[in-house]
């Protein structure tokens, strides 16, 4: 476009075409560029084509409508690129400018068992982490656990009261019972409550006994959480913990600095930042409290410190916080204060890829039948029970070990894929019947699509790595499949940019459908040798892409189902 006279900053706006008659891609940027140059858009589009030589990759370029450029790619070029993708490391995909990116996700509370409310942040965040890493970025995982606050005073005091300092021997379920009992004692026993408050002060001032007990509580919790992460095939480990306690020493200095800069003022004993960008119900600037009148700090203060630390100390280019949509205003306010204070530059990207709620089929927040919170472990156990029934009804030729692996892969995969395949910004209805089925856009369907392709090679006793020759795209179904395979990178780039794994799910589902059409229309094993090898290479690249795509979602594949 620059050759035709467009400014350097004008985007060509190349998009996948919505219909085959419009080509494989459309370039829509000519109209905006022509407007800036006061030219006729179609004439400007023609000027672009007159100065463009892409004959090695393009069959045809045509101008449509007010100035769209339709691009039809050559089958020979598609075949060459697909051949390269099959042989190259990571399909030949790499990021031109890798970044250091921090992903804040999962973030359960210490001394409590993980529940379904932690599921979305954990699996959506992890899918984005995996994708960003695959694209060549340096990714820092940050598990922003709730490991600070008055609850630790209660827990330490109650453990002492029960003469049980062997916290490391306790199961987390005991800790939950301890938490409830400690809260009851705190509410009903003034002497106990005073001791708990004293322990909070001691903990914050570095008292060795309190710090030791606190560390035990954190370690027990994270060990238990790790079991959930491992079972979910999530890449978080205990070394990724960056809890609230990490930022606690920074908070007094931040409050003092915000006051010194005139951003924060004292108001009825509390320290408040008034933001003109947010109005209260009376139309006045909204006050955001960063320190309570009793001296305590708030989540906003911690999030300001976290943003500052991530830029100054970790030196990241982007920081993404995966939490639910109810946190949107809170994050906006914390980051607005962060920027007003000059703690991060405009170039530092602070992003809140929020998600909706997890609902039951009744449209209400997902609960147990008795109305309680569903523990994550219990949810995964039920998934395994249901997946066992699904697989038992279909598969009879699996060994006990094979069946166990299939059941676990389908169970966990179904829970994850059902969520990941939905646009994260919407509320998500959890429905066992819709996720544990081989019909439609589900994990079992996707896992079977992969296994089905692998079985072609197994039955024919062909090692896909031994296939030779170049790909030939003589049939339309072959061409369509090759084009879709080469759009894998585009799907991953969109996930990385938008933090939306459902884009990858939709791509994989469409790929599986296109392969199915190809499989029905284009015989493989009975074709001429050159065609046979070409089609088997396409099948091999499809299997490789499905496996890699599912792996980026944190979903396991199996060789037999």
Swiss-Prot record:
Q: Where in the cell is it found?
A: Cytoplasm
Any one Gene Ontology MF annotation carried by this entry is: arginine-tRNA ligase activity
The record lists the catalysed reaction(s) as:
tRNA(Arg) + L-arginine + ATP = L-arginyl-tRNA(Arg) + AMP + diphosphate
Q: What is its main location?
A: cytoplasm
A GO cellular component term found in this entry reads: cytoplasm
Q: Which GO terms describe its biological process?
A: arginyl-tRNA aminoacylation
Intervals of motif 'HIGH' region: 108-118
**Enzyme Commission identifier(s):** 6.1.1.19
**Top-level division of the source organism's lineage:** Bacteria
- EC class, as a word, reads ligase
UniProt KW keywords = Aminoacyl-tRNA synthetase, ATP-binding, Cytoplasm, Ligase, Nucleotide-binding, Protein biosynthesis
HAMAP family, sorted = Arg_tRNA_synth
| NCBIfam families given in the database record | argS
Protein family (similarity comment) = Belongs to the class-I aminoacyl-tRNA synthetase family.
Task: Describe its partners and assembly state.
Answer: Monomer.
Q: What is this protein called?
A: Arginine--tRNA ligase
Q: Please report the organism this UniProt entry assigns to the protein.
A: Haemophilus ducreyi (strain 35000HP / ATCC 700724)
């Amino acid at each position: 476009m620059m050759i035709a006279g467009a400014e350097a900053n004008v985007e060509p706006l190349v998009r996948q075409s919505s219909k085959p008659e419009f080509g494989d891609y459309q370039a829509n940027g000519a109209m905006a560029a022509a407007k800036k140059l006061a030219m006729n858009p179609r004439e400007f589009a023609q000027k672009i084509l007159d100065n463009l030589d892409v004959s090695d990759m393009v069959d045809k370029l045509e101008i449509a409508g007010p100035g769209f450029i339709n691009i039809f790619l050559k089958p020979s070029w598609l075949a060459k690129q697909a051949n390269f993708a099959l042989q190259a490391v990571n399909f030949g995909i790499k990021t031109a400018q890798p970044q250091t990116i921090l992903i804040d996700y999962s973030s359960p509370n210490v001394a409590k068992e993980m529940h379904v409310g932690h599921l979305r942040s954990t699996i959506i965040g992890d899918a984005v982490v995996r994708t960003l890493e695959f694209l060549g970025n340096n990714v820092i995982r940050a598990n922003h656990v709730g490991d600070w606050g008055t609850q630790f005073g209660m827990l330490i005091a109650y453990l002492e009261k029960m003469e049980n300092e062997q916290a490391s021997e306790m199961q987390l379920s005991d800790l939950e019972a301890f938490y409830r009992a400690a809260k009851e004692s705190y509410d009903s026993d003034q002497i106990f409550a005073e001791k708990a408050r004293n322990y909070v002060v001691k903990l914050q001032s570095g008292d060795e006994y309190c710090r030791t007990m606190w560390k035990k509580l954190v370690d027990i919790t994270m060990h238990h959480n790790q079991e959930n992460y491992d079972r979910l095939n999530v890449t978080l480990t205990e070394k990724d913990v960056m809890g609230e306690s990490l930022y606690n020493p920074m908070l007094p200095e931040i409050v003092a600095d915000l006051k010194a800069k005139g951003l924060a003022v004292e108001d009825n004993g509390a320290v408040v930042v008034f933001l003109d960008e947010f109005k209260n119900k009376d139309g006045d600037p909204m006050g955001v409290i960063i320190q309570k009148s009793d001296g305590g700090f708030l989540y906003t203060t911690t999030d300001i410190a976290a943003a500052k630390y991530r830029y100054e100390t970790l030196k990241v280019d982007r920081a993404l916080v995966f939490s639910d949509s109810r946190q949107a205003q809170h994050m906006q306010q914390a980051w607005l204060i962060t920027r007003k204070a000059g703690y991060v530059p405009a170039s530092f990207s602070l992003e809140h890829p929020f998600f909706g709620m997890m609902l039951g089929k009744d449209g209400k927040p997902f609960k147990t039948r008795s109305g309680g919170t569903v523990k994550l472990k219990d949810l995964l156990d039920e998934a395994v029970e249901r997946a066992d029934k699904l697989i038992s009804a279909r598969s009879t030729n699996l060994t006990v070990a094979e069946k166990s692996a299939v059941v676990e892969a389908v169970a966990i995969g179904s829970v994850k894929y059902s969520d990941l395949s939905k646009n994260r910004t919407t509320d998500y209805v959890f429905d066992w019947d819709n996720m544990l089925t081989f019909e439609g856009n589900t994990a079992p369907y996707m896992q079977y699509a992969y296994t089905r392709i692998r079985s072609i090679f197994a039955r024919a006793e062909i090692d896909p790595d031994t296939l030779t020759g170049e790909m030939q795209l003589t049939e339309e179904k072959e061409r369509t499949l090759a084009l879709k395979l080469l759009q894998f990178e585009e799907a991953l780039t969109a996930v990385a940019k938008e933090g939306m794994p459902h884009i990858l799910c939709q791509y994989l589902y469409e790929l599986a459908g296109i392969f199915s059409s190809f499989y029905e229309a284009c015989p493989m094993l009975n074709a001429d040798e050159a065609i046979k090898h070409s089609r088997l290479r396409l099948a091999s690249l499809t299997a490789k892409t499905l496996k890699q795509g599912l792996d980026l979602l944190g979903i396991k594949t199996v060789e037999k189902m």
